[in-house]
Structure formats: structure tokens, C-alpha cells
């Protein structure tokens, strides 16, 4: 097997692992095994000044602000943003939508297509994102 085929097999294995995995919490893996907190890697002494400690990569080191407060973090489901799409969108057929979708906001359409309507999105993630133990880097402290 040449190296390119081996690379493709490794990439496929990572994709399969990503598809069939579920991240429920960092605490389930880290906190009860002593990796973070207590006397593990997140402890205040020894290796505690590593990745997850207050003065490590996620904390107040020489890298600027802590990652949890001002840097990389999971989307908490609260906020507002703009999306712009440009290009040709050939659409044909019939679309039927039934049911209740409680959303708030608006969508603007422009161009050669005669379209009108409104779409809005409001809410908060039910998965607990940005709530202490969540997805992403989050807060430097597992509280």
C-alpha cells in the first residue's frame, strides 16, 4: 500500500469516527479520571500550569486573553449575524411545508427571481453549549 492510499485510509477512519461519535461533556472524560482538577493536569501545582490550568494555554499566559472569555468558544445559541449569498440558484419544483416552526427574523431576496417571504431564527441550544461543561474550548475552569 503506498503512502497516499494509507493517508486516505487514515482520513476515512477519522471521518467515520467523527460521524459516529458524540461529545456529551468534557467532564465525563476529564474530571472523574483526575486529568483536570484535583491533583491531575488541571491541579494548581506541578502539571497544573498546562493546557487547562488558569495560567496555561487556556488561561492568562503570554498569549493574551483567556481562550474561554475572548477567544475560541462554542456557539451558545444567542446572538445575531448576517449571511450573504450571491450567484445563480436554479430552483424548480414544488415545496410544501407543514407544521409549526417558531422563529423570528427576516430574509431579503433580490435579483431576477420573484420571491418574497420571511424566515427568522431565535432560541438557545438545548445541548448545553457554552454552559460550563460543553463543546469547544469553553471556559478555562471546569465549574
Swiss-Prot record:
Q: Which residues form the signal peptide?
A: 1-21
Top-level taxon of origin: Eukaryota
Pfam families, A to Z: Chorion_1
Instruction: Give this protein's Gene Ontology molecular function annotations.
Output: structural constituent of egg chorion
Q: Mind listing the GO biological process terms from this record?
A: chorion-containing eggshell formation
Task: Give Gene Ontology CC terms.
Answer: egg chorion
InterPro entries (UniProt xref): Chorion
Keywords noted in UniProt: Repeat, Signal
The role this protein plays is:
This protein is one of many from the eggshell of the gypsy moth.
> Which family does the entry's similarity section mention?
Belongs to the chorion protein family.
Identification of the protein by name: Chorion class A protein Ld5
In which organism is this protein found?
A: Lymantria dispar
Origin organism lineage: Eukaryota, Metazoa, Ecdysozoa, Arthropoda, Hexapoda
Amino acid at each position: 500500500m503506498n503512502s497516499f492510499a494509507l493517508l486516505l485510509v487514515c482520513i476515512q477512519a477519522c471521518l467515520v469516527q467523527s460521524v459516529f461519535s458524540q461529545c456529551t461533556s468534557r467532564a465525563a472524560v476529564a474530571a472523574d479520571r483526575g486529568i483536570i482538577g484535583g491533583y491531575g493536569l488541571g491541579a494548581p501545582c506541578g502539571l497544573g500550569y498546562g493546557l487547562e490550568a488558569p495560567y496555561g494555554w487556556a488561561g492568562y499566559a503570554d498569549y493574551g486573553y483567556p481562550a474561554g472569555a475572548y477567544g475560541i468558544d462554542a456557539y451558545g445559541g444567542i446572538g445575531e449575524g448576517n449571511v450573504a449569498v450571491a450567484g445563480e440558484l436554479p430552483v424548480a419544483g414544488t415545496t410544501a411545508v407543514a407544521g409549526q416552526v417558531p422563529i423570528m427574523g427576516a430574509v431579503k431576496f433580490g435579483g431576477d427571481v420573484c420571491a418574497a417571504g420571511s424566515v427568522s431564527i431565535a432560541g438557545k441550544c438545548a445541548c448545553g453549549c457554552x454552559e460550563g461543561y460543553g463543546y469547544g474550548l469553553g471556559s478555562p475552569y471546569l465549574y
